[in-house]
Amino acid sequence: YDYVNNAPAVYKFWEDRVKEVAGQENIYTLGMRGVHDGQMQGAKTVVEQKAVLERVLKDQRGLLEKYVNKDVTAIPQAFIPYKEVLDIYNAGLKVPDDVTLIWCDDNYGYIRHFPTPEEQARKGGNGIYYHVSYWGRPHDYLWLGTFSPYLLYQQMKLAYDRGIQKMWVLNVGDIKPAEYQIELFLDMAWNIEQVVEEGVTAHL
C-alpha cells in the first residue's frame, strides 16, 4: 500500500471500490496513511509526505468526478488529519474547500486542533473523530471507559462552540465498557442544548 512505488495497483484498488459503491449514499474519506495505523510508506519526510498527499487528493477526487458525480464539490467528502497527518496538514497541505475537515483527539480525550476562523468558514465545514476506545501506540484502552464523562462533555461542548458541527464520529470499539460515554456523545450530537441545560450530573 505504497503510492510512491506502487501507485498503479493502489489506484486500481481505489477505482474498483468507487465503482462498486458509486450508486450508494456515501461520505468518501480522502487521503492516505500506511498499513497497521502507521504513516504512509514510500515518503519519509513531512515535505515528501505532503507532496504525495497532494497527488493522492487530486487522484481520488478525479475518481469521484469520473464515477460518482461530474460536480465533485457536490459529493460528501471528508479529510481526517489524524496523528502524523496533522503535521502534514500544518505544513501547508491544501485540502479542497468543499471537503469536511474531521479533527481528532489525542487518544486520551483531548482534541488536538480546533478550527481557525478560516477553517470555520470553509464550505465543507468541520467535524470530529473522537475515541472512547483505542487500540494502538503508545498503549491501548479497550475494556474500560477510562476517562470522565465530564471530560467528554467539556471537549464536545468546546468543539461545538468552535464550529465543529458538520459531522461527529465516535470510535467505540466494544460497546459494553463505554455505554454511558456513547450515550452522552450521541445525546450531545442530537441535541446539545438540552444536555448543556440539564448538565452531566442530571444526564447521568
Residues covered by each model-derived region:
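Gly/Pro-rich turn-and-neighbor structural signature
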Residues: 2-123
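Structured mid-domain segments that build the active-site/substrate or prosthetic-cofactor binding neighborhood
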Residues: 103-109, 115-204
